[in-house]
């Protein structure tokens, strides 16, 4: 009798384990189906492995881009503001794209020579504010008033400034 009792208990244990496994497996399927249907929104029947990977991929890519910048939360704010501080530290970049360009490859760093020349020209204009205020310089920049200095800097950087874009392209 004792042997029968042991076998019965063992049998009961296995059945309970099987039931627990079945119960554990059953809620997993509906969860996947609900998640994929919410992700797509169309309610397509093929939602198992095909639909679940696409939503996380773009998120991971964005996180990877932020990680490449190496500043954590700062690059996102810098990119929205314009990234001027980061660009100056890296070597002169155009707007928020400066960090991304430098992170992607070295070739784009060379192309940023034009932006770097503009930064240098800005420094020159700051050192010599008389150029921006002089009336004869305004027509050359293509715009009048306070914007004449910026116009001249951009024009010089693109046309033939020592660190202009042409020199950067020729070097690369």
From Swiss-Prot:
Residues 80-100, 139-165 have a biased composition (Gly residues). Residues 1-172 are annotated as: Disordered. Residues 58-68 have a biased composition (Basic residues). Residues 1-28, 129-138 have a biased composition (Low complexity). This is Uncharacterized protein FLJ37310. It comes from Homo sapiens.
């Amino acid at each position: 009798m004792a042997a029968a009792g042991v076998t019965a208990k063992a049998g009961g244990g296995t059945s309970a384990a099987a039931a627990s496994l079945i119960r554990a497996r059953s809620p997993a399927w509906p969860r996947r189906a609900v998640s994929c249907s919410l992700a797509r929104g169309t309610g397509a029947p093929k939602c198992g492995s095909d639909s679940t990977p696409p939503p996380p991929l773009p998120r991971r890519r964005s996180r990877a881009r932020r990680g490449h910048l190496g500043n954590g939360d700062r690059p996102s704010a810098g990119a929205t503001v314009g990234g001027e501080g980061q660009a100056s530290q890296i070597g002169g970049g155009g707007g928020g794209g400066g960090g991304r360009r430098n992170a992607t490859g070295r070739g784009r760093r060379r192309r940023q020579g034009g932006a770097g020349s503009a930064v240098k020209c800005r420094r020159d204009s700051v050192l010599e504010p008389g150029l921006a205020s002089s009336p004869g310089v305004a027509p050359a920049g293509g715009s009048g008033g306070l914007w004449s200095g910026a116009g001249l800097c951009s024009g010089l950087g693109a046309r033939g400034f020592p660190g202009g874009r042409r020199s950067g392209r020729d070097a690369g």
